[in-house]
């Protein structure tokens, strides 16, 4: 779905709900100075079109990780190339099982990218060393500690496991 299929009212509704999904239809209609029936209809259509998939929460400071690192894993090409895809699937499932691993994605043919969180830089690096760098047949593990988030600070709170 592209932004072109959204008009200004749809975008305004989405912006408000993104900021606070607890808003009632009455509150949204008051803020946008539109009838409640219009807002209700638009939200229903946004849901039917799959633009609004679900309503969720972003956990706050007491729960979300204090330190983050982006980790890029390069997988060694196995002798039998057909095993690469299965091994990457195994590694991504293994990483996904850790609560410290907030996000896992495949990048290209031989790389996996993960966002990892921890309470302190020391615990974060120890987790990476003990649980990620120890995975067999990795050619390289690059760790990029995140010192400051410029946009998307809520992502860790959204991804954090409870």
From Swiss-Prot:
InterPro entries: ArsR-like_HTH, AsnC-type_HTH_dom, HTH-Siroheme_Decarb, PF0864-like_C, Tscrpt_reg_AsnC-like, WH-like_DNA-bd_sf, WH_DNA-bd_sf. PROSITE patterns: HTH_ASNC_2. It holds the Pfam family AsnC_trans_reg_3. Residues 25-44 bind DNA. Keywords: DNA-binding, Transcription, Transcription regulation. Residues 6-71 form the HTH asnC-type domain. SUPFAM superfamilies: Winged helix' DNA-binding domain (SSF46785). The keyword Translocase does not apply. One of its GO terms (molecular function) is sequence-specific DNA binding. It comes from the Archaea. SMART domains: HTH_ASNC. This is Uncharacterized HTH-type transcriptional regulator PYRAB09690. It comes from Pyrococcus abyssi (strain GE5 / Orsay).
């Amino acid at each position: 779905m592209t932004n072109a299929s959204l008009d200004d009212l749809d975008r305004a509704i989405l912006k408000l709900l993104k900021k606070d999904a607890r808003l009632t239809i009455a509150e949204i209609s008051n803020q946008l100075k539109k009838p409640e029936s219009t807002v209700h209809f638009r939200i229903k259509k946004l849901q039917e079109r799959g633009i609004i998939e679900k309503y969720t929460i972003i956990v706050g400071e007491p729960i979300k990780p204090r330190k983050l690192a982006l980790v890029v894993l390069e997988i060694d090409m196995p002798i039998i190339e057909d095993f690469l895809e299965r091994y990457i699937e195994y590694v991504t499932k293994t990483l996904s099982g850790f609560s410290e691993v907030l996000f896992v994605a495949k990048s290209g043919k031989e790389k996996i990218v993960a966002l990892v969180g921890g309470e302190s830089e020391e615990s974060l690096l120890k987790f990476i060393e003990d649980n990620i760098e120890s995975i067999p047949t990795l050619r390289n593990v690059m760790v990029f500690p995140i010192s400051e988030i410029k946009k998307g600070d809520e992502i860790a709170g959204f991804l954090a496991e409870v």
